[in-house]
Amino acid sequence: MTTVDLPLLPLGRGIDRASERGVECPGDLPPASDPDLVARALAAKEALGERLFVLGHHYQRDEVIQFADVTGDSFKLAREAAARPDAEYVVFCGVHFMAESADILTGPGQQVILPDLAAGCSMADMARLPQVETAWEALAAAGVQDSVVPVTYMNSSADIKAFCGRNGGVVCTSSNADVALEWAFDQKGGLDAGAKVLFFPDQHLGRNTAVLQMGIALEECVVWNPLLPGGGLSAEELRAAKMILWKGHCSVHGRFSSAVVDELRATVPDVQILVHPECQHDVVLKADLVGSTEFIIKTIEAAPSGSVWAIGTELNLVQRLGKEHPDK
């Protein structure tokens, strides 16, 4: 894999999350306090045999992935866990909402274990149930709730998913967001009948899907800010909108800017830009291809030898793809 030194957006833990500039990249892991840690972990895994099933999310480091029985995105891994009813212990190497999803789909005799209970997703944390319920009540007060279907991204907490279920909504993934939106609009008679979607927690996935795949105008997408009264929107703006996007974002994909895309095209001959739909809209517009994590992986796998790619997604996945495809 070839790396190019380009001026990325500055990162840091102290940066306001609303800036979408991302979070600090922690760098290399420190040496294990126990030099025999890996050997002991592998021995324990072997001893437990089929009683143990380890799931590794694509975004994990190789030091973690080495223990995984299967790798994938959050939805794929949750389904894999459900398909292994004989596994007494399901260890999910991911973040909190992922383990929650697996726990929902697995049987009562299975234990889903999150190795680090503090492992969270900043985007999932941007849509809390009390905030969403307040927004729902505000939509009723504005006279538009009856036309709205709530749609949440897989990257959300279990209580947010349950809220959508209670209110006639649905959960989507980055792979099927367009299908989910089509279904949601149909529940209220379609776009021409004034149907609307309240989409959370990632505004960018919602906007990119609505505009680029559904043909909804950019000006028909408004952003609901849960930190402002009434979401910062007037009743007139809500009535005119087709997509009400929650003001949330991915702190990793928020790193990428259209300026970086321009710099890549100017400095790397024949580069193809491949990004995740959680990237900002102006980045997606300048990319050659956009798609889910699984789409990104399959695209690189199928790409011809010698092709040059710049991938706008999580670092560990990109580095792993580079190692697996050194000819590209």
What does each of the following model-derived ranges do?
Residues 2-328:
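The feature marks the mature, well-folded catalytic cores of soluble enzymes
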